[in-house]
Amino acid sequence: MTFTFHGGEPLLAGVSFYREVLPLLSKELSHMHPEFAMQTNLWLMDDEIADILAEYKVPLGSSIDGPEDLTDYQRGDEYFTRCMEGYRIAIEHGLLVRFICTFTNSSVKRKEDIVEFFKSQGWVMKLHPALPSLKGDNPNAWTLEPEEYGELLVWLLDYAITNPSFEIMNVNDLCRCVFTRSGAVCTYADCMGSTFAIGPDGAIYPCYRFIGMPEWVMGYVKDKPSIAELMESPAGKRMTAFKDHVDLACRDCAHITYCRGGCPYNAIAPTGGELEGVDPHCTAYKRAFDEIVSRMNKEMEAPAASPMQRRSRVKRMEKPAVMPLIKRIIEK
């Protein structure tokens, strides 16, 4: 079992909170072998907090969108500097830190700069597309459209193939999904009933992304509900309805086994809980999955051919071969 401390900003809880809660959870749930993780902007990281997090081997996730000017443009002045100072402290204490990058309709135009920045830092890259805001008068101000996101994923696939020392987690996940025919991360898997989030007041949600949305409260910790009871709540039933909808709407899709309609939050939250379709990024996922499957099939055709003949065929292809990348991913 993994406990992830997520935002708001979990470092606001202060060092005393973690000195109490980490030993408590480790002791009381020792039979479940608990592990911990944290998503933080790192601004409040200091030596004391870093010490206790390092003691319990808590990996950290944070957000950097690329070079300093681009990150500050998207996240506010001095975000980059403050985040990197916290990163420095965390690294000095031996903490593992990884960054996620948000691609917007603006930053995607600088994809080369962003990838080269991550590569120059020696970081593993993880990304997600900017989604329509659920608040404000201009919800699509930063939104990366699904078609553009799909082309970005294919571009990143080629980059990962031609730069084997640089790891892009999203590309790894897509390739692993196709090769194993199973969802590699929660976006491409039926997460219902296996993933929950708990708000500061003890409210239980289907996922951290629903926290703060009262209509998605499944129950409360104080009532000690079972998983079955949580799934019988109105919010739980809406999640199950999404799964049933995917079975019907995606039944003819070649990728249904390892995509499962994408993320339920992406599909349901923007519509006020109404089930109107699958994840809006279906177009992007399908574009990337189609590309991987097409290349993989071409490279694996005519298995009786000699190694020299197969290499010759791969060389004649206009697109970089994907199987060497998949082999590296699977063998990890």
Language-model segments: what does each one mean?
Residues 1-4, 13-134:
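Radical SAM/AdoMet-radical enzyme domain recognition
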Residues 74-192, 197, 201, 209-219:
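Radical SAM enzyme [4Fe-4S]-AdoMet core and its adjacent flexible, acidic
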Residues 54, 91, 119, 161, ...:
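Alpha-helix boundary recognition
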Residues 16, 82-85, 109, 113, ...:
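Generic recognition of stable, solvent-exposed alpha-helical segments in well-folded globular domains
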Residues 212-332:
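Flexible mid-to-C-terminal extensions adjoining Fe-S/redox cofactors in radical SAM and related proteins
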Residues 8:
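Active-site neighborhood of divalent metal-dependent phosphoester/pyrophosphate hydrolases
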